[in-house]
């Protein structure tokens, strides 16, 4: 998972779904 919106979970875990923000 890319480091977005504080997403620091392992790559084998599905990243949380965030709304499209500018």
Curated annotation (Swiss-Prot):
**Mind listing the UniProt keywords for this protein, alphabetically?**
Amphibian defense peptide, Secreted
UniProt GO cellular component terms: extracellular region
Top-level taxon of origin: Eukaryota
- What are the recorded Gene Ontology BP terms? defense response
Role of this protein: Lacks antimicrobial activity. Does not inhibit the formation of NO by neuronal nitric oxide.
Q: Which family does it belong to?
A: Belongs to the frog skin active peptide (FSAP) family. Rothein subfamily.
Q: What is this protein called?
A: Rothein 4.1
Q: Which organism is it from?
A: Litoria rothii
